Amino acid sequence: MAASATTMLLKYPTTVCGIPNSSANNSTDPSNNIVQIPQTTTTNSPLLKFRTPNKPVNAVAAPAFPSVTTTTTTTPSSIQSLVKDFDPLVPAEDALTPPSSWYTEPAFYAHELDRIFYKGWQVAGYSDQVKEANQYFTGTLGNVEYLVCRDGEGKVHAFHNVCTHRASILACGSGKKSCFVCPYHGWVYGMNGSLTKASKATPEQSLNPDELGLVPLKVAVWGPFILISLDRSSREVGDVGSEWLGSCAEDVKAHAFDPNLQFINRSEFPIESNWKIFSDNYLDSSYHVPYAHKYYATELDFDTYQTDMVGNVTIQRVAGTSNNGFNRLGTQAFYAFAYPNFAVERYGPWMTTMHIVPLGPRKCKLVVDYYIEKSKLDDKDYIEKGIAINDNVQKEDVVLCESVQKGLETPAYRSGRYVMPIEKGIHHFHCWLHQVLK
């Protein structure tokens, strides 16, 4: 179990992905060393020069979703058999929880990536990360490496972060640059994904830049959130909030769309457990809190706890207390969990988001981003104490989740039972999973 330091940050941290690359350092821009591409070409040029990058790119169409390779021999029919091992029609009071294989089987995890994470909207990052032209950040979703950037015209783009020449990861971390230069063979892409230079290629090869641009992803900005979708069935972007959160969109918007909030810190927690274990833990209406989180329990008025489920969202509300002498939660805490793996929390002067990143059938990562009202920015002691309290809660949850994973791996356990009504949020989540996985 490990967690990042909680030193206060005033910008989103740089995270390195893929191969080592000096471009992860925001102070160094290798694109500054690229000669500007002229509008005309000569037949003896060692470079194949393409049109200017501000023109639209017609990149190669991406597959409906990337393939996922596993080492299991489980067949599609056996996967569906595992899905059917949970029956959503049985009343929660009598129902068995999903079998342990949902949390341990590599092929089931691959099926989840296919049916859940490669369909619909997934949070990729935050609009403040690309607030300025030429800013970018990278990330991973399953076996998909993605890149989000803002071009010189102010438009936000998302692409598969893979060079179309030899499949090298193109960019790492986050930062600001005028173009993307592949670290392998020096191919250059504009901020709109167009290929602008293929080093050492000759005009006689007839390489078509319109077929070699970065493969685009569907992208949308909704308030502070940037969302991506790998679903190629439609390139149209409609009402993103409603598509993502359904009828709960307005409730979440009322809490999250606040220009008075300032990002201050990110904490990351690697977890040796299936991603759903943390989701289950989050959705138990604080059933576990009095037993596992002694300090956090003193902050909640459990008699006021309310849990509501609509569509793919569970919203939990609870009144805060000042019994411990430090009022972190204010009068009421609001916790919205958007299935499958993202939470928006508002309490007191704080907003936190919690992103559960699946990394394998038995591994995930929790990313917690902290925001605070600007009037509190000068209160360093309050900020540091608030972050420390919440980080400690997450560390305690990591221990619980890893313990559950170990138990699920044993022959002693196959399925459990729900305690109702306090675990109705978990049951609702499991029914949603069954619906999208069948």
Swiss-Prot record:
Pathway: Amine and polyamine biosynthesis; betaine biosynthesis via choline pathway; betaine aldehyde from choline (monooxygenase route): step 1/1. Its cofactor is [2Fe-2S] cluster; Fe cation; Mg(2+). Its EC number is 1.14.15.7. InterPro entries: Rieske_2Fe-2S (IPR017941), Rieske_2Fe-2S_sf (IPR036922), Ring_hydroxy_dOase_asu_C_dom (IPR015879), Rng_hydr_dOase-A (IPR001663). Coiled coil: none annotated. [2Fe-2S] cluster binds at residues 163, 165, 182, 185. Gene3D superfamilies: Naphthalene 1,2-dioxygenase Alpha Subunit, Chain A, domain 1, Rieske [2Fe-2S] iron-sulphur domain. It holds the Pfam family Rieske. Fe cation binds at residues 288, 293. Residues 121-228 form the Rieske domain. Its main location: plastid. It is found in: Plastid, Chloroplast stroma. Expressed in roots and leaves. It catalyses: choline + 2 reduced [2Fe-2S]-[ferredoxin] + O2 + 2 H(+) = betaine aldehyde hydrate + 2 oxidized [2Fe-2S]-[ferredoxin] + H2O. The keyword RNA-binding does not apply. Binds 1 [2Fe-2S] cluster. Binds 1 Fe cation. PROSITE patterns: RIESKE. GO terms for biological process: glycine betaine biosynthetic process from choline. Residues 1-58 form a transit peptide. Keywords: 2Fe-2S, Chloroplast, Iron, Iron-sulfur, Magnesium, Metal-binding, Monooxygenase, Oxidoreductase, Plastid, Stress response, Transit peptide. This is Choline monooxygenase, chloroplastic. It comes from Atriplex hortensis. The lineage of its organism: Eukaryota, Viridiplantae, Streptophyta, Embryophyta, Tracheophyta. The gene is CMO.
